[in-house]
Structure formats: structure tokens, C-alpha cells
Amino acid sequence: MLALIQRVTRASVTVDDQIVGQIGPGLLALIGVEPGDSDAQIRRLAERLLSYRVFGDDAGKMNRSLADTGGGLLLVSQFTLAADTSSGNRPGFSTAAPPLEAEPAFNRLAAICREKHRGGVETGRFGAHMVVDLVNDGPVTFLLRP
């Protein structure tokens, strides 16, 4: 499992012209599920999403986490994130978990984050064509693995 996180001033996800998830200041996390991702890996990634320090303290140093700021978390499933791009000019998707494995893993991640984070957790819609709108703050972007 991997997450491409972006510090945002706002972000939203739209499906069929309806906003299905939106946050103000916080993190947008694009989530790629890989075959065999364990519950321990899912829990560890949730912990990292909530405790990774990407927000500025009073001195402007990245010393505050999402848990510290109480900002929003927008989770968006993105199977292309787990693609194999090591050769050729076309991605391969054998390194991404199939939907029947990926959807429960993504939902588990969202449930853990909701349980642990007071700042609000929103999601896109698994398997749907989504339009993601965001304002990246910084820009600040990191790739996290459990």
C-alpha cells in the first residue's frame, strides 16, 4: 500500500457532477493498494497519514502533523499509483491489487483513519471516474509506504 500525500488548502472529489468528498486545510491522499497488503500495513499507513509532520510550526518548520492541526483528510483510491512503470512506454497494472482485494483494504484504511482522527475524514468513490480538485499548499507532496 502506498499513499501520495499533498498538503492542501482545500480539496474535493466530484463524481457524476456531485461532490462526494471535500476538505478545507489538510491532506489529500491518493491511495494505491498492492496485492497482499496486510492489516498491519494498512494500520501502519493510517498511523503515518495522521502523524507525518508536514505542517509548519510557529517557526515555519514542518513539525506538526494532521493529528496536531486537526485538519481534514481526503482519501482517494487510485489504482494507477501502484502501476509498474519500470519499462516501456505504457504502465502495467499487475502490481496493483484487483478491485475485490483493493476495495476492502481501502475501506479499512478509511475506517481506521475515521476512528483515530478528530479532524474529519472524507473519501472519493471507489472504482468511479472521479474529478479531483485541489489547491496544493507549498507545494508539499510526499510518497509514503507503511
UniProtKB/Swiss-Prot annotation:
Catalysed reactions, as listed in the record: glycyl-tRNA(Ala) + H2O = tRNA(Ala) + glycine + H(+); a D-aminoacyl-tRNA + H2O = a tRNA + a D-alpha-amino acid + H(+)
Gene3D superfamilies: D-tyrosyl-tRNA(Tyr) deacylase
Enzyme class (EC, first level): hydrolase
GO molecular function: D-tyrosyl-tRNA(Tyr) deacylase activity; Gly-tRNA(Ala) deacylase activity; Ser(Gly)-tRNA(Ala) hydrolase activity; tRNA binding
Gene Ontology biological-process entries: D-amino acid catabolic process
Database matches in Pfam families: Tyr_Deacylase
InterPro entries assigned: Daa-tRNA_deacyls_DTD, DTD-like_sf
Keywords for this protein: Cytoplasm, Hydrolase, RNA-binding, tRNA-binding
Subcellular location: Cytoplasm
Short sequence motif named Gly-cisPro motif, important for rejection of L-amino acids, residue ranges: 138-139
Source taxon at top rank: Bacteria
Quaternary organization: Homodimer.
Family assignment from sequence similarity: Belongs to the DTD family.
Function: An aminoacyl-tRNA editing enzyme that deacylates mischarged D-aminoacyl-tRNAs. Also deacylates mischarged glycyl-tRNA(Ala), protecting cells against glycine mischarging by AlaRS. Acts via tRNA-based rather than protein-based catalysis; rejects L-amino acids rather than detecting D-amino acids in the active site. By recycling D-aminoacyl-tRNA to D-amino acids and free tRNA molecules, this enzyme counteracts the toxicity associated with the formation of D-aminoacyl-tRNA entities in vivo and helps enforce protein L-homochirality.
HAMAP family: Deacylase_Dtd
Protein name stated in the entry: D-aminoacyl-tRNA deacylase
Organism: Xanthomonas axonopodis pv. citri (strain 306)
Gene label: dtd
